[in-house]
Amino acid sequence: MHILSRVGQKLYFLISLVLVFNTGVSAQDTIKRPLEKALEAMRSGYWYEAKQLAEADGKVARDIILWHEFRSGRGSPTELREFLQRNQDWPGLPYLKEKGEQVFFESSRNEILSWFDENPPISPSAATIYADALLEAGKTNKAELIVQDKWISEVMDSDLQTVYLRKYDVALSQLHDERSIELLWRDAFEALDDLIPLLSDDYKKLVKAVVALRKYKKDGVNTLINRVPETLRNHPVLNFARFKWRLKYGYDDRAFQLLYELSEKKEYLGRPEIWGATREKLARQLLWDGDYKASYRVLSGHFVEDAKLKARLEWLAGFIALRKLKDPNSALDHFQNFIEIVESPISIGRGFYWLGRAHEDLNNLESARRAYDRASENYTTYYGQLALEKLGRSLPYDIMDPNIKLQWRNAEFIQSTVFQAAILMLAAEENGLAERFLTHLSENLSEHNLLKLESFLSELDDPHIQIRFGKRQARMGIIVFDSYFALHDMADYQWVVPVDLLLSVARRESEFDQYAKSSAGALGLMQVMPSTAQEMAKNLKIPFEEESLVTSWKYNVLLGATYLQELSYRYRGNPILIAASYNAGPSNADKWIQHLGSPLDRKTNLVDWVEMIPFRETRNYVMRVTESLTLYKTLVLGKEIDHEFSEFLGSSAYFSFTPQSE
C-alpha cells in the first residue's frame, strides 16, 4: 500500500493507534481501508453507500464523506447542523456553508428560517428561499431587505435575475439604477442586457456609453458619452471606462491626465481597488520604458485599502522614488507604509531592506543599520540574506541543526478530529486532503504544540506536507525551519546539476508534490512540460513516457535536471538567469538581458535587475529559488557558505556542467 509503505515503521504505530481508537479495527487487518473504499464510491456518485462504507472506519471517517457531500451541495439540513456542531474547527467551512445552503431548497419554512436566521444567506439563490420563508411568516420588511441587498451587490445569471424580478419587483423597483452600477464595475454585460429596459432614461444612457467603452468599440463612443446627462457625466464608472479606452487606443497623455485629476479624491475614483490593479500594470510598463516620473505619478493618490494591492503599490512607488528618481525621502514614506501593512517574513525582510537602502542614501547610517538588522532576522528570505551581507554577517550556522524534536504522541491535538481525519486520509492514500487538514490544524496551535506537530511531520517524512505546513506558518510570521526547507529523497542521489538547484526549483515548482499538474500542462516534481521532457529524453537517448513524469519522481527529476543543465550552459551557470528562464522561458530571459544587461556583467545592479523583471510571478520565482539555493547548499553540504549572497547571484556558480547532447 503506497501510503503505508512511504510512512513505514515510523508511523505504522500511529496509524494503527488512531484507527483502533476510532474503529476497533487494526490497520493490519485490511489492505484497503474502509475510508478508501468509501471515497471511491463517493467519486462514483454513490453517496449513501459511501457513508455506510466509511462508518467501518468510525465517525470521523463518515464525517469526511459528509464534508465532501455538503461541499457538493448535497445532504440534509439535519446532518448539516449536526456536522457543524461536531466539527466547528474543520477546514473550508465558509465554502461548505455556502454550498450547503442548497440542502435547504426543498426544506420546510421552519427549517429555512431556523438556519438562515442564524446564518445569513451567502448566495443570491439562497436569499430567495429565505425571503420566501420570511414572507410566509409575515416578515415582509426583513424579506425585502434580504433581496434588496443581493440585488445591488451580486451578479446573477439570467434565470436567477428573472426570478428576482418576477418575485420581488415592487421591492426592487427603485434599485435597478444602483444595480446597473455594480454590474458595470464588474463587466457583467449579459446581466445588463436584461436590466436595461428597467433603468431610468439617464442610467440607460450611462450604461450604453460605459458598455461601448468597455467593449472597446471605436465608432460612436463620443456620441454615446455626450448623451449621458451632466449629472452622470463624471460618474467614476464612466471615467474608468474612458481611461481604459484611451489606453487601449494609444491616447496615453489624455488617459494619464484623467487619472491624475481623479486621484485628488477617493470619491472621484469610486472603486480605488479596480483602478489600483491598472495603476500597477501601467506603472510597471512605464518603468520598463524608462518614463520614471510618469510611472511614479501613476501610483500617487491611489486610495487603495486592500492590503495586498496597497502593499504592492507602496513598495513599487518607493522603489521608483529611490532607484530611479533619486528621492530617498519620498521612498522612506512608501517603504514605511509597506512595512505597516505586511506580515510575512518575505515581505518584512523586503520592506526593511529597502528602508535601509533609503536611509543609506540619506547617510542615516545608524537608521540604515537598524533597518538591515530587522531585515536580517528573516534570513531565510532573499532580502534577509541581502541584509546580512550589508551587515557583514553570514547565515546563522545553527540552520544545520534540526529543530528540537518534541514528543508529539501526548499532544493535545491528537484528540482533535481534524488530526484524526488527516491520519485516516493518509491511510486512505489521500495525501492532498491530509495536507489540507494538517496545515489547517496548525493555524490555531500554540508555538509549543506547533513544534510537536512539526515533530510529527518530520516523522511522517512527506516533504510535500512539510513544505505546505512550513509555508503556512511562514505566512503567519513563524519559521519552522525543518519543514519550511524540507529535504526530498532526491538529495540522496547524484544528478547532472547540483542537488541544491534541484531542491530549490522543485520546492518552488511543485512543493515536492510528484503528482502535481499545472493548468498549463506542466507535470510532476519539477513541473516539466511534456514537450520539453520529450526533447530531454531524446537527448539522453531514453524512452519518453509522459505518464512516468507523474508516476516516477526519479524520471521526472532526471529530465528536469537535464533541462536545467542546458539552461546552466546557456546562461553560464548564473543562478538568476537559470531561475528566470526555467520559469518564463529562455526567450523572455534573453529579452531581459538585452534590455537590462546581464547579471554576469559586474556593471549590472543585480538587485535592481530582479526587481525590473516585468512578470510578477517570475520576479517572485527568482527570489524564492535563489534564497533557497544557499540554504539547501548549507543543509546538503553541512558547512557554512563562504561567499556573499550578491556575489553568488552574479556568479557562474552552476557553469561546470555541459549538456549531455554535446
Task: Kindly give the residue locations of the regions a language model identified.
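Solenoid-like repeat scaffolds
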Residues: 51-60, 71-74, 82-91, 104-105, ...
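Short coil/turn linking the two alpha-helices of tandem helical-hairpin repeats
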Residues: 70-73, 101, 108, 138, ...
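Bacterial N-terminal signal peptides
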Residues: 10-22
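Structural motif corresponding to the intra-repeat A-B loop/turn of tetratricopeptide repeats
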Residues: 44, 137, 186, 215, ...
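Catalytic glycan-binding domains that act on GlcNAc-containing polysaccharides
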Residues: 60, 67-69, 81-86, 249-254, ...
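Residue at a conserved register position within TPR or TPR-like alpha-solenoid repeats
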Residues: 41, 104, 134, 183, ...
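Structural register within alpha-helical repeat arrays
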Residues: 37, 64, 69, 100, ...
